[in-house]
């Protein structure tokens, strides 16, 4: 009963569930054709079948006691590891892992996977809004050089190049020289004032020394006035651009009326100023006349005093 079982297993190829056993089996017999059976050495007792006679048995031809080398029966090796692929399992590329096509990660079991570690050199990174003006300027210059280099490389390769977007105009606006509004050296006030100086003159001089009511000097007031004029002109131009034709005509007529009204007011003020100038001339003449009369009165008083002294002199001589 043992011969039919042995003959049935002799013609079946050796199979294995572990890919490592298949690889070792192929390395031992690289030149063996795929259909050929492997001869088992006689001295190896592990490959003898259970039906073969033990030591001391009688030889026979094809029987149980024959000493002829028999081909090895079917041996199935079970892989103890759970990572070995089962029969019919396929990899990522569709390869049959059970037929020896194991991925290199499973073949190299002892090699560890390389893990990239962070650099020991710490990168001093700070948010852009926390940088100072000098640090922002250096950062923008570095980014500008890098962008110029990349744009040059893209232009050399024939790729379309867009203009570099930068914030340098903000730095230029910040670096503009602005007038010093608070650190001016103002002249000191006089320690003593004359008695004939009025309070109004004193307040005017104090306002001029302090640079006006806002506490700024002449440069600061000019800067504010120029800034206001530029802002008003820009706003007025934008408002005119947004107006329609009818609105522009209406605005023009209103401006003409305002101009004529201002001209009439100017003429009236000019006439009043001329009349006031005439009155001032009359007042000036009267003041000169008053000064002349005062001088004459003083002269008459001195002459009268001299006459009185002359009259008293003869009376004193007569009494002696």
UniProtKB/Swiss-Prot annotation:
<feature type="region of interest" description="Autoinhibitory acidic region; in absence of 7SK snRNA interacts with the basic region preventing interaction with P-TEFb and modulating subcellular localization">
    <location>
        <begin position="171"/>
        <end position="211"/>
    </location>
</feature>
<keyword id="KW-0175">Coiled coil</keyword>
<feature type="compositionally biased region" description="Polar residues">
    <location>
        <begin position="9"/>
        <end position="19"/>
    </location>
</feature>
<feature type="compositionally biased region" description="Acidic residues">
    <location>
        <begin position="197"/>
        <end position="212"/>
    </location>
</feature>
<feature type="modified residue" description="Phosphoserine">
    <location>
        <position position="213"/>
    </location>
</feature>
<feature type="modified residue" description="Phosphothreonine">
    <location>
        <position position="197"/>
    </location>
</feature>
<feature type="coiled-coil region">
    <location>
        <begin position="244"/>
        <end position="310"/>
    </location>
</feature>
<feature type="region of interest" description="Disordered">
    <location>
        <begin position="174"/>
        <end position="223"/>
    </location>
</feature>
<keyword id="KW-0539">Nucleus</keyword>
<feature type="modified residue" description="Phosphoserine">
    <location>
        <position position="221"/>
    </location>
</feature>
<feature type="region of interest" description="Required for inhibition of ESR1-dependent transcription">
    <location>
        <begin position="271"/>
        <end position="316"/>
    </location>
</feature>
<feature type="region of interest" description="Mediates interaction with CCNT1">
    <location>
        <begin position="247"/>
        <end position="275"/>
    </location>
</feature>
<dbReference type="GO" id="GO:0120259">
    <property type="term" value="C:7SK snRNP"/>
</dbReference>
<dbReference type="GO" id="GO:0005737">
    <property type="term" value="C:cytoplasm"/>
</dbReference>
<dbReference type="InterPro" id="IPR024872">
    <property type="entry name" value="HEXIM"/>
</dbReference>
<dbReference type="GO" id="GO:0045087">
    <property type="term" value="P:innate immune response"/>
</dbReference>
<feature type="compositionally biased region" description="Basic and acidic residues">
    <location>
        <begin position="24"/>
        <end position="47"/>
    </location>
</feature>
<dbReference type="GO" id="GO:0034244">
    <property type="term" value="P:negative regulation of transcription elongation by RNA polymerase II"/>
</dbReference>
<dbReference type="GO" id="GO:0106140">
    <property type="term" value="F:P-TEFb complex binding"/>
</dbReference>
<keyword id="KW-0805">Transcription regulation</keyword>
<protein>
    <recommendedName>
        <fullName>Protein HEXIM1</fullName>
    </recommendedName>
</protein>
<dbReference type="GO" id="GO:0004861">
    <property type="term" value="F:cyclin-dependent protein serine/threonine kinase inhibitor activity"/>
</dbReference>
<dbReference type="GO" id="GO:0042802">
    <property type="term" value="F:identical protein binding"/>
</dbReference>
<dbReference type="GO" id="GO:0002218">
    <property type="term" value="P:activation of innate immune response"/>
</dbReference>
<dbReference type="GO" id="GO:1901798">
    <property type="term" value="P:positive regulation of signal transduction by p53 class mediator"/>
</dbReference>
<dbReference type="GO" id="GO:0140416">
    <property type="term" value="F:transcription regulator inhibitor activity"/>
</dbReference>
<dbReference type="GO" id="GO:0005654">
    <property type="term" value="C:nucleoplasm"/>
</dbReference>
<keyword id="KW-0399">Innate immunity</keyword>
<keyword id="KW-0597">Phosphoprotein</keyword>
<keyword id="KW-0678">Repressor</keyword>
<feature type="modified residue" description="Phosphoserine">
    <location>
        <position position="198"/>
    </location>
</feature>
<feature type="compositionally biased region" description="Basic residues">
    <location>
        <begin position="109"/>
        <end position="124"/>
    </location>
</feature>
<comment type="subunit">
    <text>Homooligomer and heterooligomer with HEXIM2; probably dimeric. Core component of the 7SK RNP complex, at least composed of 7SK RNA, LARP7, MEPCE, HEXIM1 (or HEXIM2) and P-TEFb (composed of CDK9 and CCNT1/cyclin-T1). Interacts with the N-CoR complex through NCOR1. Interacts with ESR1 and NR3C1. May interact with NF-kappa-B through RELA. Interacts with CCNT2; mediates formation of a tripartite complex with KPNA2. Part of the HDP-RNP complex composed of at least HEXIM1, PRKDC, XRCC5, XRCC6, paraspeckle proteins (SFPQ, NONO, PSPC1, RBM14, and MATR3) and NEAT1 non-coding RNA.</text>
</comment>
<comment type="similarity">
    <text>Belongs to the HEXIM family.</text>
</comment>
<dbReference type="GO" id="GO:0007507">
    <property type="term" value="P:heart development"/>
</dbReference>
<keyword id="KW-0391">Immunity</keyword>
<keyword id="KW-0963">Cytoplasm</keyword>
<keyword id="KW-0804">Transcription</keyword>
<feature type="region of interest" description="Basic region; mediates nuclear localization and interaction with 7SK snRNA and NR3C1">
    <location>
        <begin position="111"/>
        <end position="138"/>
    </location>
</feature>
<dbReference type="GO" id="GO:0097322">
    <property type="term" value="F:7SK snRNA binding"/>
</dbReference>
<dbReference type="GO" id="GO:0000122">
    <property type="term" value="P:negative regulation of transcription by RNA polymerase II"/>
</dbReference>
<dbReference type="Pfam" id="PF15313">
    <property type="entry name" value="HEXIM"/>
</dbReference>
């Amino acid at each position: 009963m043992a011969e039919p079982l042995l003959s049935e297993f002799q013609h079946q190829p050796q199979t294995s569930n572990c890919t490592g056993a298949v690889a070792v089996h192929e390395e031992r017999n690289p030149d063996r054709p795929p259909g050929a059976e492997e001869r088992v050495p006689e001295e190896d007792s592990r490959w003898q079948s259970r039906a073969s006679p033990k030591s001391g048995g009688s030889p026979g031809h094809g029987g149980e006691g024959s000493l002829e080398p028999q081909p090895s029966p079917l041996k199935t090796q079970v892989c103890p590891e759970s990572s070995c692929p089962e029969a019919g399992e396929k990899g990522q590329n569709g390869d049959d892992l059970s037929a020896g096509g194991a991925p290199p990660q499973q073949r190299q079991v002892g090699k560890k996977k390389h893990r990239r570690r962070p650099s020991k050199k710490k990168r001093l990174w700070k948010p852009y809004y926390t940088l100072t003006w000098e640090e922002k300027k250096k950062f923008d210059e570095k980014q500008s050089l890098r962008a110029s280099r990349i744009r040059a490389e893209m232009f050399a390769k024939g790729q379309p190049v867009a203009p570099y977007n930068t914030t340098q105009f903000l730095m230029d606006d910040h670096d503009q020289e602005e007038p010093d509004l608070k650190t001016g050296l103002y002249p000191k006030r006089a320690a003593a004032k004359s008695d004939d100086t009025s309070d109004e003159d004193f307040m005017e001089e104090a306002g001029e020394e302090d640079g006006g009511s806002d506490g700024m000097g002449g440069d600061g007031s000019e800067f504010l006035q120029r800034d206001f004029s530029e802002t008003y002109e820009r706003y007025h131009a934008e408002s005119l651009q947004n107006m329609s034709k009818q609105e522009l005509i209406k605005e023009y007529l209103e401006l003409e009326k305002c101009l004529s009204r201002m001209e009439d007011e100017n003429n009236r003020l000019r006439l009043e100023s001329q009349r006031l100038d005439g009155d001032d001339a009359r007042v000036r003449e009267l003041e000169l006349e008053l000064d002349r009369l005062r001088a004459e009165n003083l002269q008459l008083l001195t002459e009268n005093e001299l006459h009185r002294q002359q009259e008293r002199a003869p009376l004193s001589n007569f009494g002696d």
